[in-house]
Structures are given as C-alpha cells and as structure tokens.
Amino acid sequence: MKQVDLNADLAEGCGSDEALLQLITSANIACAQHAGSIADIRAALAYAQQNGVRIGAHPGYPDRENFGRTEMNLSEADLRACLNYQLGALQALCRDQGLEMAYVKPHGAMYNQAAKNRALADTVARIVADFDPKLKLMALSGSLLLEAGKAAGLGVISEVFADRRYMPDGTLVPRSRPDAQVDSDEEAIAQVLQMVRDGRVKAVNGSLVAVQADSICLHGDGPHAVVFAEKIRQELLAAGIKVSA
C-alpha cells in the first residue's frame, strides 16, 4: 500500500490550526519570525499533541511585513543566528510540553532560494545538522536543498505541493505569476493522485516532471483551507493510499 504524509504551515495566526491538525499528519510550526506569536506556537503544539501529529520547525527570514516571502542574502553568520534562534525557541517550547521536534522545513523565500542555490542549500543543511543531526530536512522534491540535506548526513523528506503549479525544471511557478496556483479542488486532487501514484506532475508547458511524494503540502491559510484538506485526505484514502507521517 502506498503511503503519504500530509503537512501544513501552522502557528501563522490564520485561525484554522485546530481543525487542520485533525486532518494532517505533520505540522510545520512557524517560529514567530515571519508570522505568528509564542501563543500561536503553544496552541498549535497542544493541538498537535492531542492529535498525534509529527512536529517540524518552519523557520523563515525575519520579514513580517512580507510574510517571509522576500528574498534575502544573509551572511552565513547571520543566517546561522537566524535559524538557531528559531530552532532553539521551538525546541524549548516542544520540550516544555513533552514533545519532540522531528524535522525542519524552511519557509517562503528561504525555501525557494535554497531549492535553486546550492551554496545557500549547503549552508542551511549544515546549520540544521550542527543544531541537531537527528532532525530531518523537508524540502522540495528534486531540489538542491534536498540534495544538500543528504550530503550533510540528514534524513530528508521529499515534498510536493497540492495547490501549486510546477515549472518544467521541477521548481514551483513563482507566486508573482497569475498561474502559480492550481485553479480548482478537482485539479489539485488530480495532481496529488498523479504525484503519489505515478511519481510525476504535469508542468505548465505540458511536460511531465518526475517527483518523489513523501509529503504533500496543503495550504494552511484562508477560509477554504480546512475544506480543501478534508477533500484531499478523503480522496487519498478512497484511492487506497495510507495517510501517515
């Protein structure tokens, strides 16, 4: 039986965390830099604990104004401080509630930059490995960040996106483009099933791109987030695919 993990970005102040944590199997917990607060983190951790959901850190650039989606070029020392600050805070809050942090998934611009920039990818992976070599690194399927995680000796989680379109090189269509998002739930469900069952996704030019779907990212914000997550989970189960971290 095929198996896939469902993840979503939480503790970003969007208000749907409690409901989503009854549907997903991995929670990417924002670390109060690009969005959210300590109260949001503690609440998300409590809901995750209630539902047996795997916990990961979701650190981003310190860019609240743009939700961590603006590219930055930090020095290695500044990036190390930025990540250690966030990982350390979440790890402490996890331990305070008797929980373990299992993986790291960078947020927004950091995630996308590291997917294409090997030097940045190596730096991020090295910082995570230095912080705790037992942590896994979640990154875009086929990305340089995924390769860097393996090279650093980390376990990796290959991620695909339910509601984002893909470029022919396997990267995500930039959010600045009008075709970045998948238009309908039906199209997103078809894309998810294709990625999980066939290991392929249709790019914007019609070509098929190979992907490894260990985990599917679902949108965690907006009023439709919970309904969308319910549909994706139901369709996976109906197709005989186990949903588990």
Curated annotation (Swiss-Prot):
Keywords: ATP-binding, Hydrolase, Nucleotide-binding. Its EC number is 3.5.2.9. It comes from the Bacteria. GO terms for molecular function: 5-oxoprolinase (ATP-hydrolyzing) activity; ATP binding. The keyword Manganese does not apply. It is an enzyme of class 3 (hydrolase). It catalyses: 5-oxo-L-proline + ATP + 2 H2O = L-glutamate + ADP + phosphate + H(+). GO terms for biological process: carbohydrate metabolic process. HAMAP family: PxpA (MF_00691). This is 5-oxoprolinase subunit A. It comes from Neisseria meningitidis serogroup C (strain 053442).
